[in-house]
Amino acid sequence: MDTIGHHYIVEAAGCDPNVIGDANKIREIFLEAAKRGNMEVKASYFFKFSPMGVSGVVIVAESHISVHTWPEKGYAALDVYTCGENADPEKAVDYILEQFKAQYAHVSEIKRGIEEEDRTFTHTILTWEERLDRRNGKP
């Protein structure tokens, strides 16, 4: 089944508020995640809300990595979308969750742009949950 893109939608919980509340730290994490996922960075923008929370995006040649955070809840809404065959969005997601020190992740992988016989497009969705123990240095 050929697909134009892979879109990961991640609900990350139990994240370190000091990490997900720091726009500069998230930018560093996303730039490294793009590198690890074999993505070519084109631009980035991050905004720190008052009193807390960050929204940001890294535009990559293959599509984007974006986030909205709620440090007071330890929650981050993460999106990683890539097109093409060379990028590895799952590596980027894994690295971001590790750096956010997420305790839990609900992940949906959407295979987008699946061409139908009548030249329309559809998608498939695979969803899973992971309990993570990252705060104690365990993967």
From Swiss-Prot:
GO terms for cellular component: cytosol. It catalyses: S-adenosyl-L-methionine + H(+) = S-adenosyl 3-(methylsulfanyl)propylamine + CO2. Pfam families: AdoMet_dc (PF02675). Keywords: Autocatalytic cleavage, Decarboxylase, Lyase, Polyamine biosynthesis, Pyruvate, S-adenosyl-L-methionine, Schiff base, Spermidine biosynthesis, Zymogen. One of its GO terms (molecular function) is adenosylmethionine decarboxylase activity. The active site is at S63 (schiff-base intermediate with substrate), H68 (proton acceptor), C83 (proton donor). Binds 1 pyruvoyl group covalently per subunit. Is synthesized initially as an inactive proenzyme. Formation of the active enzyme involves a self-maturation process in which the active site pyruvoyl group is generated from an internal serine residue via an autocatalytic post-translational modification. Two non-identical subunits are generated from the proenzyme in this reaction, and the pyruvate is formed at the N-terminus of the alpha chain, which is derived from the carboxyl end of the proenzyme. It is an enzyme of class 4 (lyase). The modification Pyruvic acid (Ser) is found at S63. Heterotetramer of two alpha and two beta chains arranged as a dimer of alpha/beta heterodimers. This is S-adenosylmethionine decarboxylase proenzyme. It comes from Pyrococcus horikoshii (strain ATCC 700860 / DSM 12428 / JCM 9974 / NBRC 100139 / OT-3).
